[in-house]
Structure formats: C-alpha cells, structure tokens
Amino acid sequence: MTVNGEEVVEYFHRGVVCHVVGCDLALPLDVEMQRSGENEVVAAKRLLERVFTEYSRFFDVVVADALYCEAGFFNFCIQHGKDVVAVLKGDDRHLKRDATLRFSSMMPQCWDRQKRQIEAWDLDGFTTMTDVDCPVRVLHTHEKRMAKKLVDGKRVNAIEESDWWWATTISQSRLSTQQLWKAGHSRWDIENDSFNELSRSWGLDHCYKHSPNAIVAFILTTFIAQVLLQSFYKRNLKPDRRAGLPLIGLAREMFTDWVNAGRSAMWLTGHSHADTS
C-alpha cells in the first residue's frame, strides 16, 4: 500500500468464521485465525472440529464458497455427519463440464422470487467430482432481475443477468430445487449481516492489540455484543419502537443511557434521545 506517496508494507490478520444462515438474526458461532503459511480451508477444518462438537445440533449443512468445493472438505464434512453446499466455479472442472452437457438436453424449472426470474437445472448422481465419498448433486440457475443503472446521468431500468452453480451432497429426494437455491444464496448472509455490518459499525476491521489471544478475544466479544443487541432489538422491542431506529442507533441509545444515569431508556418511554433533547 502507499502512504503519503511512499510504498509501505501492510500487515493484516486473516480468520475464518462459522455463521448460522437462514434466520433473522446474524449468529456468528466461532472464529479461527489462519496460521502463517496455511490456507483458509485448513483453518476452517480446525474451526469446524470445534463447532461440530459444541454446536452439533445447530445445523445439518455447511454452506461455503468456491474455495471449499474440493473432495477433501466434502469428505471431512461427510465424516462428521454433515452435508455440504458449495459454490461451483471454473470451466476446467470435470464436474461442471459433465453437468453442462447433461443440462443441455433438459428443460429448466422456472419460478419468480425476490423480484427475480429464475431458470434452474438440477440433477444428482454425479460421480465426476474426483475422490468424493458420495455422488454429488449440481444446481445451475440463470437469474434475471430489474435494476436501476446510471446512464448519461439518469437512472434507467435495466435487466441484470447472472449465472450460479452449486455442488452439494444433498440429494433431490431430501431437498427441493427451490430450497437448495435458497440455501446456496444464503451463503451471502455472513457477508451482509456480519462482516459488512461489523466492519462498518462495530470496528471489526480494527486491530486493537497485536496479540493472537487478544485478537480472538476482541472478535468473540464483538460477536457476543452483536448477538445480544440483535436479540433485544428483534425479540423485545415492538415494531413501533424499532421504526426509524437502526440496530446501531439502539447501541448509541444504550451508550447514552450508561453515561446519563438519570435518563429514561427510549424503549421504556417510546421516545428516542433525539426526541427528548
């Protein structure tokens, strides 16, 4: 990176997070920091060894991005009694080429969801993912949605198209095409609900102390604080109390109450700090 026109060395820490998807709360379960010279999947396996023990009943399926679409990771999860859904990328993969050939003679399933038009091709029984301990299912979707784009300074409607591929150990008899599609897209919950929110409003991207134990302690403390605050916000506050008050706004209200002991909490009075000043 460059600072004041001079190139300097940038240091950063990398970690892997396990996060529950598909619910209305952002629920990060645990974090494992990557060690020097190791890749993300190695750290993820170490993390999941703990999570499979501590939170075994929380989930049945591990949803992951394309980095985890490999036999070693699939077999690791299968051996622990868990299924896998992973993004499938790369035109050179035997599995994707095989699926593309078989899908070419199929009519897609079609449905509309979340302002999208979806065409889906779904088959299981693939054995071309080398060294995986069970047959693999592949889902491919072509999706269209109307979006606003800026053209010559004006916002105009434009159709955006995207293609998605997933590989999974879950057979069609156990999970429908639409349910698998939803599970595959839920992989982004960890980005939208945790990483982006925690970096933007909770200081997750700031290293307060360069010590391995301290880094993990700060991250886990942040996770706990976010989960507790969300639980109070979504499970305790009534809709009229939440109206116009974002989650981070509630955090600021709580902080204000702590430093102003005589002030009534807005969730008791129904007025925000801005209303009472």
PLM features: residue spans?
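A short, flexible helix-boundary coil/loop motif
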Residues: 111-130, 199-277
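Active-site beta-loop-alpha junctions of metal-dependent nucleic acid enzymes
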Residues: 32-54
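Active-site-proximal, Lys/Arg-enriched surface segment
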Residues: 1-23, 30
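Short amphipathic alpha-helical "interface-anchor" segments enriched in bulky aromatics
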Residues: 174-209
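A short alpha/beta connector and helix-capping loop motif
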Residues: 1-3, 71-89
